[in-house]
């Protein structure tokens, strides 16, 4: 029989042995000769040259296997000043240089969005940040744009329109485009002229201090933006609103200057955190667009994420070893406690798990790679279906589904606001009585304007996640005018289509059978 305390073997260790640290006798795992300087994972020690080759190969492989950027295409690099986006700009800068082995063949530009007003910075602090940003942008040699977030108050409603998307060519079309590009370069080189360095004729370089880009925003717009973010109740809704406005502004700048692609510096770690955050926010239907390599929801401008294979640890090592310049800019969640928002909570959760289980980020990231972009079944399926007013994704909430919580809330709100209507007024169809340019706050208060709830009209044009975030905005007045104008245009367009359907005569089943 077994006895208490009887030993049948050696006792198991209480905790796993620590990972071996690189010593002077250890060599690089790649070249087996040089002394390692960084340890990416347990046992993966690289020397300086091998680590650079490993890092650059990841970036080139991500662009090469997807083949979405054609030669000569204009690409806008969204630079925030952080480590990942700075490393992305540096990779593009080196890839477009003449001494690169496999040179990139697109035309690059850089954009920086000044978000100081949303973060509560003063004009002096914002000017100091811009003074650090402009020398870095000038050093790249790319055409660059510095825009303030306040410019969202001057955007047109067309920024929320999904333009027709050009069909992406097959692999044969991409190879044909490359061959045609190389043939053009050979002809230019044979003519004796200097070859371009970015895939086509070098665009004119911006002046050293372009005054049109350095002008401060209007004080009225700064006050309006501050009022908007101060009116939002939760930090989670503030971060989502900031991301939405930033995306709309970058999208407008890309269209205005002829860019068909936008590169963002989302790293593997950041995308893993974003995946878990979006699941908690109710954006599970859009994970393939929010975390994938390409995001085609905007139609004519495609967002790509070439840094999605690099972890934050690799980015930090590369920037440190090769002196990649970056600028620290405070965000809305800077110095916020861990449980201040869903974004901060998920970030702390993932990073804490990563320290204990080093494969956490890679596991979540590999899961996101398996997500496929598929059309949604139902009335909202297809590219021509209704889209969210803010995130521009296909609506995941059917307006005809009265069993949803939002349908019940909307019906309750409308029943409370609707006043008794005399019989003489029921003979007149309730059509829109205000012009499309009139905002919700300035509507006349008669006819359909009196019976419609502006909050409900906007909520029915939002996806589930954006509806939840809109609950933290007590009033619609602080929203930028282009959002309110587009919401009113969609409402009037839907009313007009419904009126046309009511006037159409449908064939009965008997008449259809006889014909």
Curated annotation (Swiss-Prot):
Species assigned in the record: Homo sapiens (Human)
Keyword set, alphabetical order: Acetylation, Cytoplasm, Phosphoprotein, Primary microcephaly, tRNA processing
One BP term from GO: tRNA wobble position uridine thiolation
UniProt-annotated location(s): Cytoplasm
Quaternary structure, from the entry: Component of a complex at least composed of URM1, CTU2/NCS2 and CTU1/ATPBD3.
Disorder association: Microcephaly, facial dysmorphism, renal agenesis, and ambiguous genitalia syndrome: An autosomal dominant syndrome characterized by primary microcephaly, ambiguous male genitalia, dysmorphic facies, polydactyly, and unilateral renal agenesis. Variable brain, cardiac, and skeletal anomalies are present, including corpus callosum agenesis or dysgenesis, lissencephaly, atrial and ventricular septal defects, patent ductus arteriosus, hypoplastic right ventricle, and joint contractures.
Residues modified as Phosphoserine: 415, 419, 435, 508
High-level lineage: Eukaryota, Metazoa, Chordata, Craniata, Vertebrata
Protein name: Cytoplasmic tRNA 2-thiolation protein 2
Modified sites of kind N-acetylcysteine: 2
UniProt function note: Plays a central role in 2-thiolation of mcm(5)S(2)U at tRNA wobble positions of tRNA(Lys), tRNA(Glu) and tRNA(Gln). May act by forming a heterodimer with CTU1/ATPBD3 that ligates sulfur from thiocarboxylated URM1 onto the uridine of tRNAs at wobble position.
GO function terms (MF aspect): nucleotidyltransferase activity; sulfurtransferase activity; tRNA binding
């Amino acid at each position: 029989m077994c006895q208490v305390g009887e030993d049948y073997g050696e006792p198991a260790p209480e905790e796993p042995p620590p990972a071996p640290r690189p010593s002077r006798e250890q060599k690089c795992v790649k070249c087996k000769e040089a002394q390692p300087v960084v340890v990416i994972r347990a046992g993966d020690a690289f020397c300086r040259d091998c680590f650079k080759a490993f890092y650059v190969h990841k970036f080139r492989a991500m662009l090469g296997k997807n083949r979405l950027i054609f030669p000569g295409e204009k690409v806008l690099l969204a630079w925030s000043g952080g480590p990942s986006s700075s490393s992305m700009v540096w990779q593009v800068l080196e890839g477009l240089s003449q001494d690169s082995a496999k040179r990139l063949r697109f035309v690059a530009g850089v954009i920086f969005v000044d978000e100081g007003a949303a973060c509560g910075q003063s004009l002096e602090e914002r000017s100091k940040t811009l003074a650090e940003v402009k020398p870095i942008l000038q050093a790249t040699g790319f055409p660059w744009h510095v825009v303030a977030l306040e410019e969202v108050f001057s955007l047109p409603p067309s920024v929320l329109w999904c333009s027709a998307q050009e069909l992406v060519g097959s692999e044969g079309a991409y190879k044909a485009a490359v061959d045609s590009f190389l043939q053009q370069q050979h002809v230019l080189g044979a003519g004796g002229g200097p070859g371009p360095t970015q895939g086509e004729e070098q665009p004119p370089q911006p002046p050293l201090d372009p005054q049109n880009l350095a002008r401060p925003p209007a004080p009225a717009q700064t006050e309006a933006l501050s009022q908007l973010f101060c009116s939002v109740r939760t930090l989670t809704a503030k971060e989502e609103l900031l991301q939405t406005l930033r995306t709309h502004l970058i999208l407008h700048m890309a269209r205005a200057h002829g860019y068909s692609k936008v590169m963002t510096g989302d790293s593997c770690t950041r995308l893993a955190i974003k995946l878990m955050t979006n699941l908690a926010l109710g954006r599970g239907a859009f994970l393939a667009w929010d975390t994938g390599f390409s995001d085609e929801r905007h139609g004519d401008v495609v967002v790509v994420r070439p840094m999605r294979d690099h972890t934050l640890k690799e980015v930090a090592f590369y920037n440190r070893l090769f002196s990649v310049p970056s600028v620290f800019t405070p965000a809305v969640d800077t110095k916020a406690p861990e449980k201040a928002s869903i974004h901060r909570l998920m970030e702390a959760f993932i990073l804490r798990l990563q320290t204990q289980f080093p494969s956490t980020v890679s596991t979540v990231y590999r899961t996101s790679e398996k997500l496929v972009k598929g059309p949604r079944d139902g009335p909202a399926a297809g590219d021509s279906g209704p889209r969210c007013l803010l995130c521009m994704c296909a609506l995941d909430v059917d307006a005809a589904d009265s069993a949803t919580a939002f349908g019940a809330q909307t019906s309750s709100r409308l029943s409370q606001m609707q006043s008794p209507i005399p019989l003489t007024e029921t003979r007149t169809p309730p059509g829109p009585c205000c012009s499309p340019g009139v905002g919700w706050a300035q509507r006349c208060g008669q006819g359909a304007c009196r019976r419609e709830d502006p909050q409900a009209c906007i909520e029915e044009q939002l996806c589930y996640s954006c509806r939840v975030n809109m609950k933290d905005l007590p009033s619609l007045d602080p929203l930028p005018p282009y959002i309110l104008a587009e919401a009113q245009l969609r409402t009037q367009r839907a009313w007009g289509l419904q009126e046309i359907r009511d006037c159409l005569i449908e064939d009965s089943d008997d008449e259809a059978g006889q014909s």
